[in-house]
Swiss-Prot record:
Pfam families xref list: Complex1_LYR_2
Top-level taxonomic group: Eukaryota
GO biological process, one term: succinate metabolic process
Protein name per Swiss-Prot or TrEMBL: Succinate dehydrogenase assembly factor 3, mitochondrial
UniProt organism field: Aspergillus fumigatus (strain ATCC MYA-4609 / CBS 101355 / FGSC A1100 / Af293) (Neosartorya fumigata)
GO CC list: mitochondrial intermembrane space; mitochondrial matrix
Keyword presence, Mitochondrion: yes
Family: Belongs to the complex I LYR family. SDHAF3 subfamily.
Function: Plays an essential role in the assembly of succinate dehydrogenase (SDH), an enzyme complex (also referred to as respiratory complex II) that is a component of both the tricarboxylic acid (TCA) cycle and the mitochondrial electron transport chain, and which couples the oxidation of succinate to fumarate with the reduction of ubiquinone (coenzyme Q) to ubiquinol. Promotes maturation of the iron-sulfur protein subunit of the SDH catalytic dimer, protecting it from the deleterious effects of oxidants. May act together with SDHAF1.
Keyword Chaperone in record: yes
Lineage of the species this protein comes from: Eukaryota, Fungi, Dikarya, Ascomycota, Pezizomycotina
Alphabetical keyword list: Chaperone, Gluconeogenesis, Mitochondrion, Transit peptide
Subunit note: Interacts with the iron-sulfur protein subunit within the SDH catalytic dimer.
Compartmental location: Mitochondrion matrix
């Protein structure tokens, strides 16, 4: 995320994105957001889910470290910031994934989501019931 210096105080509205974020909400820099998510996991998740969540967050941030497309960076940071806010507010329990977000996902992302769902439902890696 080499371009994040220019994007530190950018909002989705200034980048042309039609997001539900208010214009006053600035995106956190990647490192601050990463640390915030790990802190929220420590406070809100039970130990098994925390391990799963932490490893997923670490791998996603690592995979997006060298992304140069500003719109991709904004989308990535926006979604992770919304995730952190939901986790902090307890509004996430039992919430379903928005269909419009699911429609925008690639086949690879849907596969990742399915694997994540299976890991959550079957945390000990047991075989099918």
């Amino acid at each position: 995320m080499r371009l994040f210096h220019r994007l530190l105080m950018a909002t989705p509205s200034t980048m042309g994105s039609k997001s539900s974020l208010s214009e006053a909400l600035a995106l956190l820099p990647p490192l601050q957001l990463y640390r915030r998510i790990l802190r929220v996991h420590r406070r809100k998740l039970d130990p098994e889910m925390r391990i799963l969540g932490d490893s997923y967050v670490k791998s996603e941030f690592r995979a997006h470290r060298n992304v140069e497309n500003p719109l991709h960076i904004i989308g990535f940071l926006t979604e992770w910031q919304l995730y952190a806010q939901k986790l902090e507010g307890d509004a996430w329990v039992g919430e379903k994934l928005d269909k419009s977000k699911l429609d925008k996902m690639s086949d690879q992302q849907i596969g990742q989501l399915y694997e994540l769902m299976q890991a959550i439902k079957n945390p000990e890696g047991e075989g099918k019931e």
